[in-house]
Amino acid sequence: PDLVAHSEAVSRLSMALAQKLDLAPMRVEDAVLAGLLHDVGMRELDYDRAYRNRTPTEDEKARYQKHPVLGEEILKGTGLDEVASAIRHHHERWDGTGYPDRLAGDAIPFLSRLVHVAEVFDVLSVPGRYRPTVSAERALEIINRGKGHQFDPQMVEALVMVVT
């Protein structure tokens, strides 16, 4: 299914970014897990199957925006607190316009910022990921335009080094 393939791809790219950023081995493992599990809350919504072939309503979009919190709740009590936090905040934006908590800049957990850029690159550049696909080069252009607004500039620079 698309959600599984997407999660695997985000996990692999998160690992590559973590390694490029010279994170300690345990932090690389956390990045891999955060990438793999970032959309685990979607299972509670059945979003992948329900809305694939149509535009969701505003109510459905609001439900969708709860998946990071649902994902964090699924991981509570597992000892993966940093991964759970990364999952909760992977839709936060550098400028504070994201969700669920409208965090900005360095207030967004580091792994959330890493997973966010990996996820957007995958959604933009891989066929069958919920929207029309663009080339990897075009995806990088789009992400570069969001540097300092949607994305942490450090993560964008690491992404460019990893995928080019």
Segments (PLM) and residue ranges:
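Histidine- and acidic-residue-rich, metal-dependent catalytic cores
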Residues: P1-T164
